[in-house]
Amino acid sequence: MRKTITATPRGLMVDSFPYRLYQKAKKVGTWNPAEIDFTQDAKDWQAATDTQRQSILRLLSQFQAGEEAVTLDLLPLIMAIAKEGRIEEEMFLTTFLFEEAKHTEFFRTVLDAIGEKGELNLLLSDSYKQVFHVILPETMDRLITD
């Protein structure tokens, strides 16, 4: 059975570091990837050389995959914190998850704007995949049962 924390005399620990981060996130986390105009980026992409495009695409694919991985893998941490009743940390981590989701949207929007729809996982190194596709999810999933 869940026990409500904020409805008790304890309330919220408004002076705690996680709660202050939560307040800061509400103030400064107001950007929207869908509102960014990538028209000039698309033109610059077309003007870039093949070598430049390959380098940029490799970087974009790493950012895209990394942001998506963090978006997916933060939930077990939030669940573990919630089970411990650390509401202020949970509140902050939900804003962190929201920002990671926006990063995922941002990089996908960039890729769409420049017309890149191909299989980007092919550009990721084996060591990158090991960290973000194997180690990170396995480690974070342990938080659910540990």
Task: Show which residues each predicted segment covers.
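Non-heme di-metal
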Residues: 1-146
